[in-house]
Amino acid sequence: MRTIIEPFRIKMTEPLKITSREERVRALREAHHNVFLLDAEDCCIDLLTDSGTGAMSAQQWAALMLGDESYAGSRSWKRFEKKVRQITGIEHVLPTHQGRAAEAILAECVIRHGDVIPNNSHFDTTRANVEYRGGIALDLPCPEAFETDVPAPFKGNIDVAGLRRCIEEHGREKIPFCMMTVTNNTGGGQPVSMANLRAVRELVDHYEIPLIIDACRFAENAYFVHEREEGYGDRSLLDIAQEMFSLADGATMSCKKDGLANIGGFLVCRNHEWAECFRNLLILREGFPTYGGLAGRDLEAIAVGLQEALDYDYQVYRHATVEYMVQRLSDIGVPMVLPAGGHAVFLDARKMVPDIPPIQYPGIGVVNALYVAGGIRCVELGSVMFGKLDESGEERPSPLELVRLAFPRRVYTQSH
């Protein structure tokens, strides 16, 4: 694969600490073989997450100086609200300090004990917020999502037939909303097609069930739709994103991903009664509805970042970076989720170390080995993160044992 030129100049740098193998072995032992307990400075290449770890642009840094820190009705809030409404087309906009806060407010207002929340795949904080309220987080990925080496174009899709069976089994009264995660992080950063979203919209409309989008990587999903779905190749990413949100009744968002910021999120909805409940909880948990736990300068940076995330040249670079890594690893026979996801490389730990059974956590073994070998910090997305106990108390492994190497935005070059 050809070298990609990063579409930006670097204005500021941070030195990397190069450690020896012996130092890394000692650090990992002191961290009890839990990479989350490592000191960040001991991680030469930190691919633990793409959330809040990116580099802001010069325009975002400049926007910080415009921050209006008024408690209520600040100029920064107005700019933030205007940008979110432009992209989503949704009336009620509530800022939060990050995405999980938006999920928690949604869950507390809407979910009751025993409710079922179907999703293409919940990520960990979404699942935790559903289950904390006594709900059942039900993953319904499309069948091809489980075939990691099959390069289907939209492996993030939901199983629409499975969703229909779920609704018929549990009943509309037990499903306060259906959720779609774009892109599907748990399933390998894979995209959701517009056709799949429309099919879900048609189905939930029939049963009068609201549709909520987990929009953390909405711009990356829009790029995939532009590149892979017929009829969208001549549309702007903003136009595609607007169509995507037009199919939803609301959305949660971590602006630490496709807001290109280090903190922040939002919750949007069309339902006036929901919005009133959301605002009341926002005041209690986060802050006044025009700042939501964020400084005015953060609202400014997010407003700029949301626009920059929809820049086509940026997305070309972003996806080419991931594709380059996938191609290089594939060339030497490393099993992984194909095709390349939008924000990360997902290694198939079950195939990499087939002698380690799932209940002995092959993903953790691969994560620790990568750190010892090269100072690379990444994360397991398998039975440690998503495993469950069955009714007898026995451990039930996750369907997939993945290791995610998530790429912080605009931080590392191809040389890294």
Which residues fall in each region the model found?
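Conserved alpha/beta core surface patches that mediate binding of polyanionic ligands
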Residues: A161, I283-G287, C378-E391
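Short, conserved charged micro-motifs
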Residues: E276, P354-P362, R410-H416
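Beta-rich nucleic-acid/ligand-interaction surfaces
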Residues: A102-I105, A344-A349, G387-L389
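Conserved glycine-rich beta-strand-loop-beta hairpin in the small C-terminal domain of fold type I
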Residues: V322-E323, V337-A349
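Active-site loop ensemble at the mouth of alpha/beta enzyme cores that anchors a bound cofactor
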Residues: V322, R350-C378, S392-S398
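PLP-dependent enzyme catalytic core of the Aspartate aminotransferase-like
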Residues: M385-H416
